[in-house]
Each structure stands twice: as structure tokens, then as C-alpha cells.
């Protein structure tokens, strides 16, 4: 099959360390076929990806390149990822991370300029707080597009570490579990009114078999083979109509 970029065959190149360095595609056009680089990779001396170049418009002579640059801290944790459109020089997407001594992410700043609509673009910072057991207890999201408006979400847990509540100040979601610590219900409330309840069922092997949504009346059912591999998903709506995904 041929992709929308005209690529109908791929070849892979590796360096002496066995690290993937290039993906090449055979591009079919009216003038015949030519081999072009679809993506290239460079690494640091430890094998961590430093840079990826994606070549987007392979059918035209002036390939559109997106360069993805990755930087790491002294503990080899990703510190920053930047995706730049080399045709315009504009940073299209970027992520910056900070960590605590346990390598939990404490702050993430995200910029996403890919959406065409300004309202859909992203420029925000999210701060994460953890308890002594390393469980996430709070996130604070600062929206830099909207006068640094903030949104806080808090999380609570039971004594065995199951999340029992999520609260964003407007909506509260409570979680209950069965004796095997499998999620049994998720109840979403707005104010004092119940907005939605999801009910979960499992088979004797612990596979999730059903998810029922009381708000929509929809039930998702999951079937497994003898080796507990998912083999079928079916969705039944409130009118009893079933769609099967195999």
C-alpha cells in the first residue's frame, strides 16, 4: 500500500551499535520512484536519542522538516523536548520537566502550536505534589494563554493505595473497590448531584468484562481467549443496539 506521501516501501539503516539511524522510503510519483529519507536519528554516547528529523512532504522537492531535539539531566531523565519546523523556524511543540529526588515529575511545561485554531493551542505549566509514599496528591495547572488562570485537582487514597477520590473543585469522582482491590464503581458528582456512575465487572481471572455507564446507558463488554488475551469488544447502547469490534 502507498501512504498519502507516496511512500510504498520502507528500509531501515543502523549504525555499528545497532541503533536505528534512518528510515528510508521508496516514493512513487509520476516520474517514477526515488528513495528518500523519511526519518533520521542521532544519539549521544550512551544511546539516548538526541535528535530526530521527520521529513513530511516527500512528494515535493523541498522537503518539510521537523526537528525534534531531546536533552537530559545528569540522571538521564528527559529534561526538555523541542519540535521545530525547520521551514519556518517556529517551535511547534515543546515540553520541559523537573523532578524530585525520587524521580517523580514535579513540574511539566507544555507548548503546542500545531492546532490551527488559537483556542486549541496549549501553553501551560502543571505542578505535581506527592505524599510520602510517592502517590500523586495534587496537580495545579497554570494556563499561560488565559492570564495564568489556575486549576487544582486533589487526589486521596485508601490504606492500600487505591485512589478513592478525585476533586477539581467543580466535579468530584469517588472510586470503590471489591475485596480484590479491583475498581468496582466510579461515581461522578457535580455539587451534590450525581452526574454519572460507571460500574465495572471482572471474570474469575481478573479480566475486566463489562463497563456500564448509567448516564449514557452504554455497556462495553470484553471477551478473552483461553490465554486471557482480549479477543472481542462489543458496545451496547441504551436502545440495545450492539456494535462489535474484533
Regions found by a protein language model. Name each.
Residues 1-246:
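Acidic/glycine-rich beta-solenoid
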